[in-house]
Amino acid sequence: MASSLTCTGVIWALLSFLSAATSCVGFFMPYWLWGSQLGKPVSFGTFRRCSYPVHDESRQMMVMVEECGRYASFQGIPSTEWRICTIVTGLGCGLLLLVALTALMGCCVSELISRTVGRVAGGIQFLGGLLIGAGCALYPLGWDSEEVRQTCGYISDQFDLGKCEIGWAYYCTGAGAAAAMLLCTWLACFSGKKQKHYPY
């Protein structure tokens, strides 16, 4: 099978896929923020949540439903900052995934990735990582929302966790973005083979 990638390009393709997968998994999982409410563990992502309180009519009290899911609507996301974070991080993950899949195709298709295409792909990866980084930076601005305050002991505020902890998915998303920005962007510059010029 012919490849349009150099040896460095193959490493770039694999690292691109790993960084994109890491960021996408972290973005989708609702484990960015951990806390507890009514004695049950609660976790949040940007657009998903695990465990939420509902009013039990039969017992006339609040009980925790221990299941994970998306918010019912985009407006249901607890804060404007988290809505922006969802859009920005989602766009960044989409860009990283697009480049990663193109890079993997370059392992099998000749003349798909030239030096110029590799450099453009690296630029797109840098932009994707930057968007995800911006999303990660915006996320703490939503810690003052009522839902988060209920979970974090009513003492959380912007950039103040209260009784909550940052979850593994937040680190996962940020690590994938950092790898894309720092490592993959650099490797992309050396990924494509020099194009052959055919005299037609």
UniProtKB/Swiss-Prot annotation:
Highest taxon of the lineage: Eukaryota
Identify its membrane topology class. Multi-pass membrane protein
Where is this protein primarily located?
membrane
Q: Where in the cell is it found?
A: Membrane
What are the record keywords, sorted?
A: Membrane, Signal, Transmembrane, Transmembrane helix
**Where is the secretion signal located?**
1-23
A GO CC annotation recorded here is: membrane
This protein's name? LHFPL tetraspan subfamily member 6 protein
Its source organism is: Rattus norvegicus
Tell me the name of the encoding gene.
Answer: Lhfpl6
